[in-house]
């Protein structure tokens, strides 16, 4: 995508921000997206290149800015399927910066029953805004709302309202073990391994090293090297895949005990 088709910017960056001057090129970039990914034609009609999202922030840009589409265009059908998917992900994230804000009305209800306090949160969507681009995504942590929020309209409730508890139930549950790593969560955790270090001085040193680095909180490697680190662990037989999960092997656990 970058070297052959010139469709995206430097692809080994983990920065999520853009320099302010990039905003001046927004119109040209959006036009290029429309030429390359015609499936975004309708969405582009709702994009406003004059909008400036929080992603445009000079202070948050490190050595390289976020990965975005370029002003170049190409024949989408000539791209491999994997290249098509990656370009669409990058283009959609860029396009979302020029959509209106997602707006909702939140109602928080706190009530007392038999000297026990209960709390309920409900969000009523007013305008989908940029989230309309992600309607069909399932399990996307970037756009998921509050886990405990209900999609109900509770705005008619008033302070002091009374009600009757018509039923209740108790569901026995067991504490679940931490979720297995996936490639995404493992890469994310490599940016903040300091939280697992028991040596206080070493932990503080790692955190201090990453001070003022967006997205880094005492990690190992860089965005450009972490994939190689993980690949090396697979090659040495320390990691293996089980379905979508990445787990340690017996060799890795034996080595850890040495």
Predicted regions and their residues:
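Core catalytic DNA strand-manipulation module of type IA topoisomerases
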Residues: 2-258
């Amino acid at each position: 995508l970058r070297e052959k088709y010139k469709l995206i910017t430097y692809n080994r960056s983990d920065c999520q921000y853009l320099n302010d001057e990039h905003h001046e090129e927004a119109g040209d970039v959006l036009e290029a997206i429309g030429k390359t990914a015609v499936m975004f034609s309708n969405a582009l009609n709702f994009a406003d290149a004059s909008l400036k999202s929080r992603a445009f922030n000079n202070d948050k840009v490190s050595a390289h800015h976020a990965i975005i589409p370029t002003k170049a265009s190409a024949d989408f059908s000539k791209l491999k399927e994997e290249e098509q998917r990656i370009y669409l992900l990058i283009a959609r994230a860029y396009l979302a910066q020029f959509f209106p804000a997602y707006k909702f009305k939140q109602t928080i209800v706190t009530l007392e029953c038999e000297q026990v306090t209960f709390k309920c949160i409900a969000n009523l969507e007013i305008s989908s805004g940029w989230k309309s681009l992600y309607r069909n995504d399932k399990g996307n942590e970037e756009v998921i709302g509050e886990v405990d929020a209900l999609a109900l309209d509770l705005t008619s409730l008033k302070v002091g309202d009374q009600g009757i508890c018509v039923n209740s139930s108790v569901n026995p549950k067991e504490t679940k073990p931490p979720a297995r790593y996936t490639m995404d969560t493992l890469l994310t955790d490599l940016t903040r391994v300091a939280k697992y270090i028991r040596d206080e001085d070493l932990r503080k040193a790692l955190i201090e090293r990453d001070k003022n680095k967006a997205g880094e909180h005492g990690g190992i490697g860089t965005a450009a090297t972490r994939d190689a680190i993980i690949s090396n662990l697979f090659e040495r037989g320390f990691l293996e895949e089980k379905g979508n999960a990445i787990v340690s092997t017996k060799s890795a656990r034996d080595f850890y005990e040495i």
